[in-house]
């Protein structure tokens, strides 16, 4: 799901960069998070933010076994503080020698955590 404001996934450069994967992925665009949440239904939300809880301390016992959404913000600005009230905010801790994580890398780490921790 892509929630506005967001990058234009239909931009020709984006489609070219996907090397054809664009045509094999279902993409849904939403005008707001509220619109997305209404359609997504009952689920857990995990916004990834600098003010979130340490990802490593969050275990399956602390959440029901149901669908969940991993929420990421813009690479330069992240998510608005309003997302602190949405679900369970999490943070990917890293060494002080690392300035920041690229959005793609952060999403990859989070998905690995999700599939490994929750045994999907």
Model-derived regions: residue spans:
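RNA substrate-binding interface of SAM-dependent RNA methyltransferases
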Residues: 1-52
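Structured adenosyl-cofactor binding patch, chiefly the S-adenosyl-L-methionine
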Residues: 9-23, 80-120
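Short, surface-exposed amphipathic charged segments that create phosphate/polyanion-binding patches used
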Residues: 40-45, 61-65, 105, 109
């Amino acid at each position: 799901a892509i929630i506005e404001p967001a990058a234009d996934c239909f931009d020709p450069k984006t489609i070219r960069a996907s090397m054809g994967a664009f045509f094999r992925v279902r993409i849904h665009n939403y005008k707001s998070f509220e619109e997305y949440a209404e359609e997504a239904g009952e689920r857990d939300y995990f916004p990834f933010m600098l003010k979130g809880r340490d990802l490593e301390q969050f275990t399956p016992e602390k959440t029901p076994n149901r669908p969940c959404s991993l929420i990421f913000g813009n690479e330069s600005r992240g998510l608005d503080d309003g997302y602190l009230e949405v679900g369970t905010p999490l943070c990917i801790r890293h060494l002080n020698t690392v300035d920041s994580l690229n959005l793609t890398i952060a999403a990859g780490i989070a998905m690995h955590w999700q599939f490994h921790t929750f045994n999907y």
